[in-house]
C-alpha cells in the first residue's frame, strides 16, 4: 500500500468541511497520478469515489493521457451520495484546479464548477451503491440537478449493492453485546434486549416491542416524518431508542421526546459504535424512514442481528 499525505492539507480536526477543501482534494487527486511513475506502477483501473477524488479521471483525460504509461488506464467513478457534488466558483479553475479555460466545459454546470459532473463525463464507468439508486438518480427529484448529465451517459451507469462486513457485524461473536446468539440460539436475543433496557433505564420487559433508530440526524434521514405520528406511536405499548447526532433541530426534538415520553423513550445524542451494535441486537424493530437512501447499511446490519427493519421505499 502507498499512502499519500501532506500535513498542511490533512492534519486537520476533520476530514471534510475545511475552507480549502477544493485545494486539498485537487492536490490529492493530482498526487495520485503523479505517484504512478515514482513507484513504477501504472494500474489497469483507477477507482475514484465521490467529489473528493472526482478530479482523478478529469486530470487523467486532460493532462496525463498522452504521457508514457497513462494511455491505457481506465477509470471507475463511484457515487455514494449525489447530493454532495463539489461545487465551486468558476474563478478558481486555473488558480486552484490547474485546468485551462479551454477545458472548462468539462467541469462547468449550472453556472459553477461541478467536480462530480466532470468525473461523470470523464470516467469509463460510473457506479452507485445500489441498482435502485442508479435508476433514482436519473430522476430530477433524487439527482440534485445532475439527471441530464447522467441520462446522456446511462450506457456507463451501473448499480452495485453495498455490503457489510459480516465478521464485524456478527451476533454470534460480537464483543459489544451482552449475550451472543446465532440463528440456532436466537432465543438468547431477549437477553440483549433486557440488557439494553437496563442500560438505558427503561422498564425491563422482554415482551414490549422495542424500536431502535441509529442514524445521522439530517433531513435526508426522514426525521420530520416521525414528528406528526410520535404522539400516536407513544400511546401504544412500545419503547423506542434513538442514537445519533446531526442537525440541532432534530437533536432538540429527540431530547424533547426523551423528556415527554421518558417512561418509554430514550435519546442518546451522539454516536457510539458499541451502543449502536447493542441496539441492533436488543431491538425488535429497526426504524429507517429515510427520504433518500442511496443504499443504506443499517437495514442490512439490523437483519444480520435478527431485527426487523421498517423502511421507506427508496434506495
Task: Name every feature range the model reports, one short phrase each.
Residues 1-315:
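Catalytic cores of nucleotide-sugar-dependent glycosyltransferases that transfer UDP/GDP/TDP-activated
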